[in-house]
Amino acid sequence: APLWDIVPLLAALYRDRTISTELREDHELISGLATENYRLAVLTEPVRGHGLVSRKYGEEHLMFSLPAGHPLAGRKSLRFSDLNGAAIPLRPGIGFWEEIPRKKMPDSHFFVQERSSSFEELVHAYAMPCFSSDLARRGRELEPDRVTIPIDDPEASVEYFLAWRRQDEDFLRPFLDAVLREAPRGK
């Protein structure tokens, strides 16, 4: 979700550069920064040392999106265990958010829908529960036939940190000035 804001800003500020993204584990991104494969990374933990700098960028909170008629739809909050055993479609390219429910809901059946349109059709046609987040919902109208309910488990919340090599700070200054004056995002 942080890339939804970051990539367009980078593209606008660095028009003469190619902007590319990869979804990787934090340790792989840190290694890529250290070996100069990356100039900027979004991590879920702050990093210090090895010539790297990080600053909090924002946070994200996972939620269940349920059909309005679902037995749990009236609850103020839920835990992963409340829907353990359910069949739940997942959007593609959600990175670590795919692994957390798999670990916390071992009896559930998860299946990734490769196209967003297929995901939406499936969720609505079969009135299935799915995941959303405060960042995914930002700027979007709530669907009248669904409710979103926060997940209380600590694993359902994450902080994001921008990380970069200190030697790239001058190059990244326009981006850092623009994005960090507005941070943190989420909640």
Which ranges hold each PLM region?
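Central regulatory/effector-binding core of bacterial HTH transcription factors
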Residues: 1-49
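Secondary-structure junction motif
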Residues: 2-6, 80, 84-108, 172-176
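Short beta->alpha connector loops
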Residues: 24-27, 46-48, 69-71, 94, ...
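Hydrophobic hinge/microswitch elements
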Residues: 25-30, 34-37, 43-44, 89-149
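Flexible hinge/capping segments at coil-to-helix
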Residues: 50-62, 66-88, 173
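Short beta-strand->loop
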Residues: 53-63, 68, 130-138, 142-158, ...
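A late-sequence structural motif
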Residues: 147-187
